[in-house]
Curated annotation (Swiss-Prot):
Subunit structure and binding partners: Interacts with the APC/C complex. Interacts with the chromatin-bound cohesin complex; the interaction is indirect, occurs after DNA replication and requires acetylation of the cohesin component SMC3. Interacts (via the FGF motif) with PDS5A and PDS5B; the interaction is direct and prevents the interaction of PDS5A with WAPL.
Residue segments, region C-terminal Sororin domain: 242-264
Motif FGF motif positions after renumbering to this chain: 166-168
Residue positions of motif KEN box: 87-89
Predominant subcellular localization, coarse grouping: nucleus
Family: Belongs to the sororin family.
Phosphothreonine: modified positions: 97, 110, 114, 159
Modified residues (Phosphoserine): 20, 32, 34, 78, 82, 106, 222
Any single GO CC term annotated in Swiss-Prot or TrEMBL for this entry: chromatin
Subcellular location: Nucleus; Chromosome; Cytoplasm
Name listed for the protein in its UniProt record: Sororin
Free-text note regarding domains: The KEN box is required for the association with the APC/C complex.
Biological-process GO terms, alphabetical: cell division; double-strand break repair; mitotic sister chromatid cohesion
Length: 264
């Protein structure tokens, strides 16, 4: 027992220093703030900074074009007349200058010494004389058209209760023209009834209205005479013939029912 204990003690003594020699040290050195830049240089190697390149940028400012206005403002006769009196399909070869524009806009037929603005007042008396003669002529034409009304005193029809008889001397002439007036006032020449009324309707019209019936047989205007359609005569079938026909049909039906149809 003592030997075992000594052996175990010796083994323990021997194993003690062995464990202390083989045990690795887990402690690591912490890097301070002064050592950080050295560590970054180890990770990322230093590179020389590239030289900055300058690029030229062009900035353009949009400015409105200066409008060239001619020095002398000429009075244009009409806004439709253009400065360049040329056709669109035949453009001019040279660019027109201010002098060319001034020449084309000048009014033809007027001297260069006289101004353009005073051309409207040339010979005012002749224009007034023409207008007066034309007014006189037109007034005479108008008076002719209304002279008939003025003589009768019926030119004004603005009053609602006043009747106007345009083209007639008075109300006595109206019954002979107006169809609305009673038929007793109408004096028509008596025409024989044969000429006015057709042969078929002659007996139907009473004697009092025979004179008032207008002629309906006008060539090219009156409607065509409609003829009465005649009824077709249906042939009568005797009862004895119907009975014979029924007996024959019944016999045929009975023969068809008694027929024996054999199917193998």
């Amino acid at each position: 027992m003592a030997e075992r204990r000594t052996r175990s003690g010796g083994a323990a003594q021997r194993s003690g220093p062995r464990t202390s020699l083989t045990k690795p040290s887990k402690s690591s050195k912490r890097k301070s703030g002064s050592d950080l830049p050295n560590s970054f240089s180890e990770i990322w190697p230093r590179t020389t900074p590239a030289v900055p390149v300058r690029k030229a940028i062009v900035l353009k400012k949009i400015v409105a074009h200066a409008v060239e206005v001619p020095d002398v403002h000429t009075v244009r006769r009409s806004p439709r007349i253009s400065f360049i009196l040329e056709k669109e399909n035949n453009p001019p070869l040279k660019v027109p200058t201010k002098e060319d524009l001034f020449k084309t806009c000048s009014v033809p037929g007027t001297p260069s010494s006289t101004p353009v603005l005073y051309t409207q007042n040339v010979e005012p008396d002749s224009g007034e004389a023409e207008l007066d003669s034309r007014d006189l002529e037109m007034s005479q034409k108008v008076r002719r058209s209304y002279s008939r009304l003025q003589s009768l005193g019926c030119a004004s029809t603005s009053t609602p209760g006043r009747r106007s008889f345009f083209g007639f001397e008075g109300p006595d002439d109206l019954p002979g023209v107006s169809p609305v007036v009673c038929s007793k006032l109408i004096e028509t020449p008596k025409v024989p009834a044969k000429d006015l009324v057709p042969a078929r309707t002659k007996d139907l019209v009473p004697d009092s209205t025979k004179d008032l019936v207008p002629a309906r047989t006008l060539p090219g205007i009156s409607p065509p005479v409609v003829k009465e359609k005649r009824k077709k005569k249906v042939p009568e079938i005797l009862k004895s013939e119907l009975d014979k026909w029924a007996v024959a049909m019944n016999a045929e039906f009975e023969a068809a029912e008694q027929f024996e149809l054999l199917i193998e």
